[in-house]
Amino acid sequence: MTERIVEPKPHEDDLPVENSLRPRRLDEYVGQQTVKENLAVFIEAARQRAEPLDHVLFHGFPGLGKTSLATVISNELGVNMRSTSGPVIERAGDLAAILTNLEQGDVLFIDEIHRLNHVVEEILYPAMEDFQLDIIIGQGPSARTIKLDLPPFTLVGATTRAGLLSPPLRDRFGVTLRLEFYKVDELKLIVTRSARILGIRVDAEGALEIAKRSRGTPRIANRLLRRVRDYAEVRADGRITREVADLALRMLDVDEKGFDGMDRKILSTIIEKYDGGPVGIETLSAAVSEERDTLEDVYEPYLIQEGFLNKTPRGRLATRLAYEHLGISVRSCRQLKIY
Protein backbone atom coordinates (compact mmCIF):
# COMPACT_ATOMS: atom_id res chain seq x y z
CA MET A 1 0.00 0.00 0.00
CA THR A 2 1.37 3.41 -0.97
CA GLU A 3 1.54 6.13 1.67
CA ARG A 4 -1.70 8.08 1.98
CA ILE A 5 -1.74 11.82 2.55
CA VAL A 6 -4.33 11.21 5.31
CA GLU A 7 -2.45 8.32 6.93
CA PRO A 8 -2.23 8.94 10.72
CA LYS A 9 1.03 7.00 11.05
CA PRO A 10 4.18 9.04 10.36
CA HIS A 11 5.75 9.24 6.92
CA GLU A 12 9.53 9.30 6.78
CA ASP A 13 9.56 12.99 5.81
CA ASP A 14 7.21 13.88 8.70
CA LEU A 15 9.69 13.17 11.48
CA PRO A 16 12.16 16.10 11.14
CA VAL A 17 9.29 18.57 10.84
CA GLU A 18 7.33 17.01 13.71
CA ASN A 19 10.30 17.41 16.04
CA SER A 20 10.48 21.13 15.29
CA LEU A 21 6.73 21.55 15.83
CA ARG A 22 6.42 19.64 19.10
CA PRO A 23 5.21 21.73 22.06
CA ARG A 24 7.72 21.90 24.90
CA ARG A 25 5.45 22.80 27.82
CA LEU A 26 1.89 22.01 28.87
CA ASP A 27 0.70 25.55 28.19
CA GLU A 28 1.90 25.25 24.57
CA TYR A 29 0.03 21.99 24.02
CA VAL A 30 -3.28 22.47 22.18
CA GLY A 31 -6.25 20.19 22.89
CA GLN A 32 -6.65 17.12 25.14
CA GLN A 33 -7.80 19.40 27.95
CA THR A 34 -8.68 16.63 30.42
CA VAL A 35 -5.35 14.90 29.86
CA LYS A 36 -3.48 18.19 30.34
CA GLU A 37 -5.33 19.01 33.56
CA ASN A 38 -4.58 15.59 35.02
CA LEU A 39 -0.92 15.76 34.04
CA ALA A 40 -0.55 19.26 35.50
CA VAL A 41 -1.73 17.97 38.89
CA PHE A 42 0.38 14.80 38.81
CA ILE A 43 3.53 16.64 37.70
CA GLU A 44 3.16 19.35 40.35
CA ALA A 45 2.55 16.73 43.06
CA ALA A 46 5.68 14.84 42.00
CA ARG A 47 7.66 18.09 42.08
CA GLN A 48 6.45 18.97 45.59
CA ARG A 49 7.37 15.53 46.90
CA ALA A 50 10.68 15.56 45.01
CA GLU A 51 9.76 12.14 43.61
CA PRO A 52 9.62 10.76 40.08
CA LEU A 53 6.24 10.95 38.40
CA ASP A 54 4.28 7.69 38.47
CA HIS A 55 4.62 5.60 35.31
CA VAL A 56 2.30 6.91 32.58
CA LEU A 57 0.53 5.05 29.77
CA PHE A 58 -0.94 6.99 26.83
CA HIS A 59 -3.24 5.17 24.45
CA GLY A 60 -5.21 6.26 21.41
CA PHE A 61 -5.07 6.43 17.62
CA PRO A 62 -1.78 7.30 15.88
CA GLY A 63 -0.89 10.96 15.41
CA LEU A 64 -2.75 12.37 18.43
CA GLY A 65 0.30 13.55 20.37
CA LYS A 66 1.50 10.73 22.62
CA THR A 67 5.17 11.35 21.85
CA SER A 68 4.68 15.10 22.25
CA LEU A 69 3.16 14.60 25.70
CA ALA A 70 6.13 12.46 26.75
CA THR A 71 8.41 15.31 25.68
CA VAL A 72 6.26 17.78 27.62
CA ILE A 73 6.47 15.63 30.76
CA SER A 74 10.27 15.51 30.67
CA ASN A 75 10.50 19.26 30.07
CA GLU A 76 8.05 20.09 32.86
CA LEU A 77 10.01 17.89 35.26
CA GLY A 78 13.34 19.29 34.05
CA VAL A 79 14.80 15.85 33.34
CA ASN A 80 16.24 14.00 30.36
CA MET A 81 14.14 11.75 28.13
CA ARG A 82 15.38 8.54 26.53
CA SER A 83 13.21 7.35 23.63
CA THR A 84 12.87 3.90 22.12
CA SER A 85 10.11 1.64 20.80
CA GLY A 86 8.82 -1.85 21.47
CA PRO A 87 10.00 -3.47 18.20
CA VAL A 88 13.54 -2.06 18.62
CA ILE A 89 14.10 -3.77 21.99
CA GLU A 90 14.66 -7.32 20.79
CA ARG A 91 16.56 -8.81 23.73
CA ALA A 92 16.51 -8.42 27.49
CA GLY A 93 20.07 -7.12 27.29
CA ASP A 94 18.94 -4.23 25.08
CA LEU A 95 16.51 -3.06 27.74
CA ALA A 96 19.02 -3.63 30.54
CA ALA A 97 21.52 -1.38 28.76
CA ILE A 98 18.93 1.40 28.50
CA LEU A 99 17.80 1.09 32.12
CA THR A 100 21.30 1.11 33.59
CA ASN A 101 22.12 4.35 31.74
CA LEU A 102 19.17 6.27 33.17
CA GLU A 103 19.76 8.99 35.73
CA GLN A 104 17.67 9.99 38.74
CA GLY A 105 14.16 11.07 37.66
CA ASP A 106 14.72 10.51 33.92
CA VAL A 107 11.82 9.74 31.59
CA LEU A 108 12.05 6.54 29.54
CA PHE A 109 9.62 6.72 26.62
CA ILE A 110 8.67 3.45 24.91
CA ASP A 111 6.50 3.87 21.83
CA GLU A 112 4.42 0.91 20.62
CA ILE A 113 4.94 -0.66 24.01
CA HIS A 114 2.39 -3.36 23.17
CA ARG A 115 4.98 -4.83 20.78
CA LEU A 116 7.51 -5.69 23.49
CA ASN A 117 8.24 -9.40 23.56
CA HIS A 118 7.40 -11.30 26.74
CA VAL A 119 11.00 -11.88 27.84
CA VAL A 120 11.79 -8.17 27.65
CA GLU A 121 8.49 -7.30 29.31
CA GLU A 122 9.31 -9.42 32.35
CA ILE A 123 12.52 -7.43 32.86
CA LEU A 124 10.36 -4.31 33.14
CA TYR A 125 8.22 -5.58 36.02
CA PRO A 126 10.78 -5.25 38.86
CA ALA A 127 12.28 -2.17 37.19
CA MET A 128 8.92 -0.38 37.26
CA GLU A 129 7.81 -1.62 40.65
CA ASP A 130 10.98 -1.68 42.75
CA PHE A 131 13.53 0.14 40.55
CA GLN A 132 15.59 -3.02 40.43
CA LEU A 133 17.01 -5.03 37.57
CA ASP A 134 17.21 -8.80 37.89
CA ILE A 135 20.28 -10.15 36.10
CA ILE A 136 20.89 -13.88 35.64
CA ILE A 137 24.54 -14.92 35.83
CA GLY A 138 25.62 -18.32 34.59
CA GLN A 139 23.63 -21.15 33.05
CA GLY A 140 21.93 -24.32 34.16
CA PRO A 141 21.99 -25.42 37.81
CA SER A 142 24.77 -22.98 38.68
CA ALA A 143 22.85 -19.94 37.39
CA ARG A 144 22.01 -17.30 39.96
CA THR A 145 20.13 -14.02 39.99
CA ILE A 146 21.52 -10.77 41.30
CA LYS A 147 19.56 -7.58 41.83
CA LEU A 148 20.93 -4.30 40.52
CA ASP A 149 19.48 -1.09 41.92
CA LEU A 150 18.26 1.46 39.38
CA PRO A 151 17.77 5.19 39.91
CA PRO A 152 14.07 6.05 40.29
CA PHE A 153 12.68 6.91 36.85
CA THR A 154 9.38 7.45 35.04
CA LEU A 155 8.35 5.08 32.28
CA VAL A 156 6.03 6.66 29.72
CA GLY A 157 4.47 4.09 27.42
CA ALA A 158 2.48 4.80 24.26
CA THR A 159 0.24 2.40 22.42
CA THR A 160 -2.42 2.37 19.74
CA ARG A 161 -3.58 -1.07 20.92
CA ALA A 162 -4.12 -0.91 24.67
CA GLY A 163 -5.97 -4.22 24.61
CA LEU A 164 -2.78 -6.02 23.53
CA LEU A 165 -0.90 -5.04 26.70
CA SER A 166 -0.61 -7.88 29.19
CA PRO A 167 -2.48 -7.25 32.47
CA PRO A 168 0.73 -7.39 34.60
CA LEU A 169 2.32 -4.63 32.50
CA ARG A 170 -0.81 -2.51 32.28
CA ASP A 171 -1.36 -2.71 36.05
CA ARG A 172 2.07 -1.26 36.76
CA PHE A 173 1.20 2.10 35.23
CA GLY A 174 -0.01 4.49 37.90
CA VAL A 175 -1.49 6.88 35.33
CA THR A 176 -3.42 5.74 32.25
CA LEU A 177 -4.73 8.41 29.88
CA ARG A 178 -6.65 8.07 26.62
CA LEU A 179 -6.11 10.61 23.85
CA GLU A 180 -9.19 11.57 21.84
CA PHE A 181 -9.59 12.98 18.34
CA TYR A 182 -9.23 16.76 18.20
CA LYS A 183 -12.01 19.25 17.52
CA VAL A 184 -11.86 21.41 14.41
CA ASP A 185 -11.20 24.61 16.38
CA GLU A 186 -8.28 22.92 18.17
CA LEU A 187 -6.83 21.76 14.86
CA LYS A 188 -7.20 25.28 13.50
CA LEU A 189 -5.04 26.55 16.38
CA ILE A 190 -2.49 23.81 15.68
CA VAL A 191 -2.36 24.69 11.96
CA THR A 192 -1.93 28.38 12.81
CA ARG A 193 0.84 27.64 15.32
CA SER A 194 2.67 25.30 12.90
CA ALA A 195 2.39 27.85 10.09
CA ARG A 196 3.96 30.49 12.32
CA ILE A 197 6.87 28.21 13.25
CA LEU A 198 7.44 27.14 9.62
CA GLY A 199 7.08 30.66 8.23
CA ILE A 200 3.96 29.85 6.20
CA ARG A 201 1.45 32.60 5.44
CA VAL A 202 -2.08 31.36 6.17
CA ASP A 203 -5.23 33.28 7.03
CA ALA A 204 -7.92 32.16 9.48
CA GLU A 205 -10.22 30.68 6.81
CA GLY A 206 -7.34 28.84 5.16
CA ALA A 207 -6.32 27.30 8.49
CA LEU A 208 -9.93 26.32 9.14
CA GLU A 209 -10.26 24.60 5.75
CA ILE A 210 -7.17 22.49 6.45
CA ALA A 211 -8.39 21.70 9.98
CA LYS A 212 -11.77 20.46 8.71
CA ARG A 213 -10.10 17.85 6.50
CA SER A 214 -7.51 16.64 9.00
CA ARG A 215 -9.56 13.75 10.42
CA GLY A 216 -9.20 15.01 13.99
CA THR A 217 -5.45 14.34 13.90
CA PRO A 218 -2.65 16.92 14.35
CA ARG A 219 -0.14 14.86 12.36
CA ILE A 220 -2.45 14.90 9.34
CA ALA A 221 -3.14 18.62 9.82
CA ASN A 222 0.57 19.44 9.76
CA ARG A 223 1.14 17.24 6.71
CA LEU A 224 -1.74 18.84 4.80
CA LEU A 225 -0.44 22.28 5.75
CA ARG A 226 2.92 21.52 4.13
CA ARG A 227 1.34 20.18 0.95
CA VAL A 228 -1.05 23.12 0.68
CA ARG A 229 1.94 25.44 1.14
CA ASP A 230 3.56 23.81 -1.91
CA TYR A 231 0.43 24.49 -3.95
CA ALA A 232 0.17 28.08 -2.70
CA GLU A 233 3.77 28.82 -3.66
CA VAL A 234 3.45 27.36 -7.17
CA ARG A 235 -0.15 28.14 -8.17
CA ALA A 236 -0.91 31.22 -6.03
CA ASP A 237 0.93 34.07 -4.34
CA GLY A 238 2.24 31.92 -1.47
CA ARG A 239 -0.56 32.82 0.94
CA ILE A 240 -2.99 30.10 2.02
CA THR A 241 -6.59 31.29 1.84
CA ARG A 242 -9.76 29.19 2.01
CA GLU A 243 -9.94 29.06 -1.79
CA VAL A 244 -6.28 28.07 -2.16
CA ALA A 245 -6.60 25.40 0.54
CA ASP A 246 -9.76 24.01 -1.09
CA LEU A 247 -8.13 23.81 -4.54
CA ALA A 248 -4.97 22.22 -3.14
CA LEU A 249 -6.84 19.61 -1.11
CA ARG A 250 -9.08 18.74 -4.05
CA MET A 251 -5.95 18.21 -6.12
CA LEU A 252 -4.69 15.90 -3.35
CA ASP A 253 -8.06 14.06 -3.50
CA VAL A 254 -8.95 14.94 0.09
CA ASP A 255 -12.62 15.88 0.35
CA GLU A 256 -14.44 18.01 2.93
CA LYS A 257 -14.72 15.07 5.37
CA GLY A 258 -11.03 14.24 5.09
CA PHE A 259 -11.75 11.12 3.02
CA ASP A 260 -9.42 10.14 0.20
CA GLY A 261 -10.21 8.16 -2.94
CA MET A 262 -9.92 4.78 -1.23
CA ASP A 263 -12.28 5.76 1.58
CA ARG A 264 -14.88 6.75 -0.99
CA LYS A 265 -14.22 3.62 -3.05
CA ILE A 266 -14.94 1.40 -0.05
CA LEU A 267 -18.23 3.17 0.65
CA SER A 268 -19.33 3.32 -2.99
CA THR A 269 -18.47 -0.37 -3.51
CA ILE A 270 -20.65 -1.41 -0.56
CA ILE A 271 -23.52 0.77 -1.80
CA GLU A 272 -23.38 0.22 -5.55
CA LYS A 273 -22.25 -3.41 -5.77
CA TYR A 274 -23.81 -4.85 -2.62
CA ASP A 275 -26.92 -2.69 -2.11
CA GLY A 276 -25.45 -1.04 0.97
CA GLY A 277 -24.48 -4.32 2.63
CA PRO A 278 -24.04 -6.32 4.67
CA VAL A 279 -20.97 -7.56 2.81
CA GLY A 280 -18.29 -9.82 4.27
CA ILE A 281 -14.79 -8.46 4.77
CA GLU A 282 -13.21 -11.03 2.44
CA THR A 283 -15.65 -10.15 -0.34
CA LEU A 284 -15.08 -6.44 0.20
CA SER A 285 -11.32 -7.00 0.20
CA ALA A 286 -11.50 -8.68 -3.21
CA ALA A 287 -13.88 -6.05 -4.58
CA VAL A 288 -11.61 -3.09 -3.74
CA SER A 289 -8.31 -4.99 -4.33
CA GLU A 290 -6.98 -4.37 -0.84
CA GLU A 291 -5.79 -6.80 1.84
CA ARG A 292 -8.20 -7.64 4.64
CA ASP A 293 -5.80 -6.55 7.40
CA THR A 294 -5.24 -3.20 5.68
CA LEU A 295 -8.98 -2.61 5.42
CA GLU A 296 -9.54 -3.46 9.08
CA ASP A 297 -6.52 -1.63 10.52
CA VAL A 298 -6.11 1.37 8.20
CA TYR A 299 -9.37 2.28 6.48
CA GLU A 300 -12.28 1.10 8.59
CA PRO A 301 -11.53 2.73 11.99
CA TYR A 302 -12.09 6.31 10.82
CA LEU A 303 -15.13 5.43 8.67
CA ILE A 304 -16.68 3.69 11.68
CA GLN A 305 -15.65 6.49 14.06
CA GLU A 306 -17.36 9.08 11.86
CA GLY A 307 -20.52 7.00 11.43
CA PHE A 308 -20.19 6.20 7.72
CA LEU A 309 -19.73 2.45 8.17
CA ASN A 310 -21.26 -0.13 10.49
CA LYS A 311 -19.42 -3.32 11.39
CA THR A 312 -21.82 -6.18 12.17
CA PRO A 313 -21.51 -9.97 12.57
CA ARG A 314 -23.03 -10.32 9.07
CA GLY A 315 -20.61 -7.90 7.43
CA ARG A 316 -20.13 -4.22 6.65
CA LEU A 317 -23.04 -1.80 6.15
CA ALA A 318 -22.94 1.66 4.65
CA THR A 319 -24.90 4.14 6.77
CA ARG A 320 -27.21 6.92 5.66
CA LEU A 321 -24.30 9.37 6.11
CA ALA A 322 -22.35 7.43 3.48
CA TYR A 323 -25.22 7.70 0.98
CA GLU A 324 -25.57 11.42 1.62
CA HIS A 325 -21.84 12.09 1.36
CA LEU A 326 -21.60 10.30 -1.99
CA GLY A 327 -24.82 11.88 -3.27
CA ILE A 328 -26.56 8.52 -3.68
CA SER A 329 -30.20 8.02 -2.70
CA VAL A 330 -31.18 5.10 -0.47
CA ARG A 331 -32.78 2.81 -2.99
CA SER A 332 -34.88 0.33 -1.07
CA CYS A 333 -37.07 -0.05 2.01
CA ARG A 334 -34.70 -2.74 3.23
CA GLN A 335 -31.86 -0.25 3.41
CA LEU A 336 -34.08 2.31 5.14
CA LYS A 337 -34.95 -0.21 7.84
CA ILE A 338 -31.27 -0.80 8.59
CA TYR A 339 -30.95 2.67 10.04
Swiss-Prot record:
One Pfam family named in its UniProt record: AAA_lid_4
Protein name as annotated: Holliday junction branch migration complex subunit RuvB
InterPro entries in alphabetical order: AAA+_ATPase (IPR003593), AAA_lid_4 (IPR041445), DNA_helicase_Holl-junc_RuvB (IPR004605), P-loop_NTPase (IPR027417), RuvB-like_N (IPR008824), RuvB_C (IPR008823), WH-like_DNA-bd_sf (IPR036388), WH_DNA-bd_sf (IPR036390)
Taxonomic lineage of the native organism: Bacteria, Pseudomonadati, Thermodesulfobacteriota, Syntrophobacteria, Syntrophobacterales
GO cellular component, one term: Holliday junction resolvase complex
NCBIfam families: PRK00080.1 (NF000868), ruvB (TIGR00635)
HAMAP family in UniProt: DNA_HJ_migration_RuvB (MF_00016)
Region (Large ATPase domain (RuvB-L)): 1-182
Binding site for ATP: L21, R22, G63, K66, T67, S68, E129, D130, F131, R172, Y182, R219
Domain-level remarks: Has 3 domains, the large (RuvB-L) and small ATPase (RuvB-S) domains and the C-terminal head (RuvB-H) domain. The head domain binds DNA, while the ATPase domains jointly bind ATP, ADP or are empty depending on the state of the subunit in the translocation cycle. During a single DNA translocation step the structure of each domain remains the same, but their relative positions change.
